[in-house]
A protein has these predicted regions:
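Charged, flexible cofactor/metal-binding loops and thiol motifs
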Residues: 82-152
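A short, surface-exposed alpha-helical micro-motif characterized by mixed small hydrophobic
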Residues: 62-64
């Protein structure tokens, strides 16, 4: 399990890169093998000073692996920040919807919890153009000025 990923990592490391782009590197693996590959990538990142652009849809894996997160919707970066900033204080409605879909290993909670639905029509960017706004720390969000005031409250 994970041999293809390990071979791919070894081939990439042979060229002594400063940046590795890892597109869904653990998505087809079972959880125990995912953990092994992620631990290997973290070790290499630390020991070799690598930057890894980690592209994934599994938000639990993203939170575990990342030092900094960018949330994209339709090719546009809509929110970015540290895992703590994004997961504890999401601002963009799309980010909130994504995070609400993360499964919680508690059947009673899962049965009754609600999900946030993202409705892109809440944005009227024909009237007021959006831009990237600084929230705090390393946290930024792509909204119009009036949305920023509304969502920060």
């Amino acid at each position: 399990g994970g041999q293809r990923q390990r071979i791919g990592i070894a081939r990439v490391l042979a060229s002594n890169p400063g940046l590795i782009i890892a597109d869904e590197p653990v998505s087809a693996l079972d959880v125990s093998i995912q953990a092994q590959v992620l631990n290997l990538l973290n070790k290499l990142k630390r020991e070799l000073g690598l930057t890894i652009l980690f592209i994934a849809h599994d938000l639990s894996v993203v939170k575990y692996f990342s030092d900094y997160i960018g949330v994209m919707n339709k090719g546009r970066l809509v929110e970015q920040g540290t895992p703590e900033e994004i997961y504890s204080h999401p601002i963009h409605p799309y980010t909130k919807a994504l995070l609400s879909a993360i499964p919680v290993p508690d059947p009673a909670y899962e049965k009754w919890r609600g999900y946030v639905t993202y409705d892109p029509s809440v944005h009227d960017y024909s009237v007021e153009k959006p831009s990237m706004h600084h929230v705090e720390g390393r946290h930024y969000v792509y909204l119009s000025d009036s949305e920023m005031v509304k969502y920060i409250k």
